């Protein structure tokens, strides 16, 4: 199994960056630089309101980076797992290769890509903009990123099976990332969110992990509610159980559909 995942990982790596490998690697760095440019423009526009929006010691730039980059990783893993079965149909003719191997390889690849992107973004933010980019609690931030990885993997498996069999739901799943993006405090700080709306968003497990990630990253970060890791861990276990059970009982059906 490890050999299969290893081979799939590097196959996906080559496919991900296309035929021009050097241009693909350059884009890995160019994409976050584009994001930084956009965020810098936004930060410049609202700079005069900085002290009214952000607590002391937290820049808007780093606030946005600490939410956008982890969310991009989460979204990319879910999308890649959803498309994993259809993109590897020819490989499933070989008995050792199973869809679960593709899921693992794709999830690990996206994690590695966005981990490198995050490090590069932090390096440029610290080097050129002289911002504080070292988390105050490195282990806490790492654990939150690990929870994001696990949640995206478990959710991706569920969506992959649904995406493969239930055509009418495909459109709804496409809009899922948009909904999650605007309900997880990626852009708008929780302390600026109306209380009645925050009480509803509290049930979003991704909001918990994003807020805790920022709490571990910044000094004096204000938590608007009692966010905790146990809530997101519960959802990870629940979704992973559902996803693996659905996958296990449909693995033969997946093979049958592929052969047709």
Where are the regions a protein language model picked out?
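Hydrophobic transmembrane alpha-helices and immediately adjacent juxtamembrane helices
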Residues: 1-260
């Amino acid at each position: 199994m490890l050999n299969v995942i290893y081979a799939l990982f590097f196959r996906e790596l080559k496919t991900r960056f296309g035929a021009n490998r050097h241009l693909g690697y350059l884009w890995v760095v160019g994409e976050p630089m584009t994001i930084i440019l956009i965020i810098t423009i936004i930060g410049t526009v609202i700079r005069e309101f900085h002290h009214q929006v952000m607590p002391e010691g937290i820049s808007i730039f780093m606030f946005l980076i600490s939410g956008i980059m982890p969310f991009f990783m989460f979204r990319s893993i879910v999308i890649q797992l959803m498309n994993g079965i259809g993109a590897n149909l020819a490989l499933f003719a070989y008995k050792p290769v199973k869809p679960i191997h593709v899921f693992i390889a794709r999830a690990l690849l996206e994690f590695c890509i966005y981990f490198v992107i995050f490090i590069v973004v932090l390096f440029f933010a610290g080097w050129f903009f002289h911002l504080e980019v070292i988390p105050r609690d490195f282990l806490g931030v790492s654990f939150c990123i690990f929870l994001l990885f696990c949640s995206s993997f478990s959710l991706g498996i569920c969506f992959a099976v649904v995406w493969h069999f239930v055509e009418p739901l495909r459109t709804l799943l496409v809009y899922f990332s948009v909904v999650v993006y605007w309900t997880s405090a990626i852009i708008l700080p929780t302390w600026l969110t109306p209380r009645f709306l925050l009480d509803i968003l509290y049930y979003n497990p991704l909001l918990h992990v994003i807020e805790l990630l920022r709490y571990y990253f910044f000094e004096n970060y204000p938590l608007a509610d009692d966010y905790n890791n146990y809530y997101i861990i519960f959802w990870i276990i629940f979704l992973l159980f559902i996803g693996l059970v659905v996958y296990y009982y449909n693995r033969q059906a997946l093979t049958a559909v592929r052969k047709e």
